[in-house]
């Protein structure tokens, strides 16, 4: 996802990253998204994703859904651990 890809898109409530081969979230990609409620990431290993700076900015609180069994890995992964309380398991 490019830098500032969804920056300021206040009307978007849910984003799904369905490709398990996804590798990067750019700087401020999801910043200033006041209505965002849910981000689904279908990537089991957080180490597979490189993160830009300030990816969520001041978007407020929302849930980040990751594959079953991956919540713990995301909660302690570098770059993701600051959002530990946001993570939930995806249900299929």
What are these regions (language model features)?
Residues 52-55, 72-84:
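Short, aromatic/basic amphipathic alpha-helical patches
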Residues 2-7, 26-29, 53-55:
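Consensus positions within tandem repeat domains that build extended binding/scaffold surfaces
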Residues 9-24, 34-50, 60-70, 85-92:
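Structural signature of tandem-repeat unit edges
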């Amino acid at each position: 996802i490019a830098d500032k890809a969804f920056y300021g898109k206040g009307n978007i409530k849910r984003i799904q990253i369905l490709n398990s081969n996804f590798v990067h979230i750019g700087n401020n990609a999801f910043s200033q998204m006041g209505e965002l409620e849910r981000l689904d990431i279908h990537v089991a290993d957080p180490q597979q994703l490189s993160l830009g700076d300030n990816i969520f900015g001041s978007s407020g609180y929302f849930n980040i859904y990751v594959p079953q069994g991956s919540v713990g890995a995301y909660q302690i992964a570098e770059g993701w651990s600051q959002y530990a309380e946001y993570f939930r398991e995806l249900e299929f």
